[in-house]
């Protein structure tokens, strides 16, 4: 769910910039604006699910393009819910899955150079807290 709010009046408005919003990287490397119909909810698979499914589910690279120019007086408001394991929970691979299944080198092909790969941050036997700390350190 997203809404746009005029920061001067506090009123909910339509998006003043058709280019602004959530973009995802498709499996063939295209940057695609993610659009949902009104009242719909989108689910995005993250790297934790990628590890815990042994690569059956793949994380979706994404970014938000902000409003520019006179539209910058409008804010984009979203409500995100992050589902994650307990801090000390194991991030072990499921039985029968391999490191190669989970950290598919092909999936890294379309990442921007500024994005640290899953392969560089997650190692076998890490727990969720260790993985989170490695991820925060890589990006901040």
For each of these PLM feature ranges, what is it?
Residues 1-140:
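C-terminal flanking tails of non-heme Fe-dependent oxygenases
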């Amino acid at each position: 769910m997203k809404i746009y709010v005029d920061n001067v009046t506090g009123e909910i408005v339509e998006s003043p910039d058709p280019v602004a919003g959530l973009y995802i990287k498709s499996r063939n490397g295209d940057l695609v604006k993610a659009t949902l119909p009104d009242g719909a909810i989108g689910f995005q698979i993250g790297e934790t699910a990628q590890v815990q499914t042994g690569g059956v589910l793949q994380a979706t690279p994404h970014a938000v393009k902000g409003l520019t120019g006179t539209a910058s007086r409008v804010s984009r408001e979203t409500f995100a819910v992050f589902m994650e394991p307990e801090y000390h929970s194991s991030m072990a691979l499921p039985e029968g899955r391999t490191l190669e299944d989970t950290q598919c080198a092909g999936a890294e092909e379309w990442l921007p150079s500024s994005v640290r790969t899953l392969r560089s941050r997650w190692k076998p036997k890490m727990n969720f807290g260790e993985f989170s700390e490695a991820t925060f350190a890589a990006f901040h």
